[in-house]
Amino acid sequence: MADLKVSVVSADNEVWSGLAKQIVARTTEGEIGILPGHEPLLAILAAGEVRVTTLEGAVVTANAADGFLSVEHNTVTIVARNAELVK
Protein backbone atom coordinates (compact mmCIF):
# COMPACT_ATOMS: atom_id res chain seq x y z
CA MET A 1 0.00 0.00 0.00
CA ALA A 2 1.25 3.50 -0.81
CA ASP A 3 1.86 6.19 1.77
CA LEU A 4 0.50 9.71 2.01
CA LYS A 5 2.95 12.61 1.97
CA VAL A 6 1.39 15.16 4.32
CA SER A 7 2.05 18.84 5.05
CA VAL A 8 0.08 20.88 7.58
CA VAL A 9 0.96 24.56 7.39
CA SER A 10 -0.35 27.75 8.94
CA ALA A 11 0.03 31.27 7.62
CA ASP A 12 3.42 31.69 9.26
CA ASN A 13 4.99 28.23 9.70
CA GLU A 14 4.96 24.53 8.93
CA VAL A 15 3.05 22.78 11.72
CA TRP A 16 3.79 19.17 10.75
CA SER A 17 4.98 17.19 7.75
CA GLY A 18 5.77 13.55 7.13
CA LEU A 19 4.42 10.26 5.86
CA ALA A 20 1.05 8.94 6.95
CA LYS A 21 -1.39 6.13 6.30
CA GLN A 22 -4.59 8.09 7.05
CA ILE A 23 -5.84 11.66 7.49
CA VAL A 24 -9.15 12.71 9.05
CA ALA A 25 -10.20 16.36 8.76
CA ARG A 26 -13.32 18.44 9.25
CA THR A 27 -14.53 20.26 6.14
CA THR A 28 -17.54 22.44 5.48
CA GLU A 29 -19.22 19.32 4.04
CA GLY A 30 -18.48 17.21 7.14
CA GLU A 31 -15.67 15.00 8.36
CA ILE A 32 -13.58 13.34 5.66
CA GLY A 33 -11.08 10.48 5.74
CA ILE A 34 -8.21 10.30 3.28
CA LEU A 35 -6.37 7.05 2.50
CA PRO A 36 -3.65 6.36 -0.08
CA GLY A 37 -5.09 6.27 -3.59
CA HIS A 38 -7.79 8.86 -2.82
CA GLU A 39 -9.08 10.71 -5.86
CA PRO A 40 -7.96 14.35 -6.29
CA LEU A 41 -9.86 16.66 -3.96
CA LEU A 42 -9.97 20.29 -2.90
CA ALA A 43 -12.07 21.03 0.20
CA ILE A 44 -12.63 24.01 2.49
CA LEU A 45 -11.67 23.32 6.11
CA ALA A 46 -14.11 23.94 8.93
CA ALA A 47 -12.67 24.79 12.34
CA GLY A 48 -11.70 21.60 14.11
CA GLU A 49 -9.17 18.82 14.42
CA VAL A 50 -7.00 17.33 11.73
CA ARG A 51 -5.84 13.85 12.75
CA VAL A 52 -2.87 12.29 10.99
CA THR A 53 -2.12 8.61 11.57
CA THR A 54 1.59 8.07 10.91
CA LEU A 55 3.05 4.93 9.37
CA GLU A 56 3.99 3.78 12.88
CA GLY A 57 0.38 4.15 14.05
CA ALA A 58 0.87 7.29 16.17
CA VAL A 59 -1.84 9.94 15.86
CA VAL A 60 -0.75 13.56 15.41
CA THR A 61 -3.55 16.04 16.09
CA ALA A 62 -3.67 19.68 15.02
CA ASN A 63 -6.37 22.29 15.42
CA ALA A 64 -6.94 24.09 12.13
CA ALA A 65 -9.31 26.80 10.91
CA ASP A 66 -9.83 29.03 7.89
CA GLY A 67 -8.13 27.07 5.16
CA PHE A 68 -8.30 24.24 2.67
CA LEU A 69 -7.27 20.64 2.14
CA SER A 70 -5.82 19.44 -1.15
CA VAL A 71 -5.28 15.82 -2.23
CA GLU A 72 -3.41 14.86 -5.39
CA HIS A 73 -1.22 11.82 -6.19
CA ASN A 74 -1.01 10.69 -2.52
CA THR A 75 0.10 14.18 -1.45
CA VAL A 76 -2.11 15.89 1.13
CA THR A 77 -1.60 19.59 1.79
CA ILE A 78 -3.52 21.33 4.55
CA VAL A 79 -3.18 25.10 4.57
CA ALA A 80 -4.86 27.07 7.34
CA ARG A 81 -4.74 30.63 8.55
CA ASN A 82 -4.56 29.24 12.09
CA ALA A 83 -3.10 25.81 12.82
CA GLU A 84 -1.27 24.38 15.82
CA LEU A 85 -0.41 20.97 17.19
CA VAL A 86 -2.47 19.73 20.11
CA LYS A 87 -0.20 18.76 23.00
Residue ranges and their predicted role:
Residues 5-87:
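Compact, glycine-rich, soluble single-domain proteins
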Residues 1-3:
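Extreme N-terminus of proteins, especially the signal/transit-peptide cleavage junction
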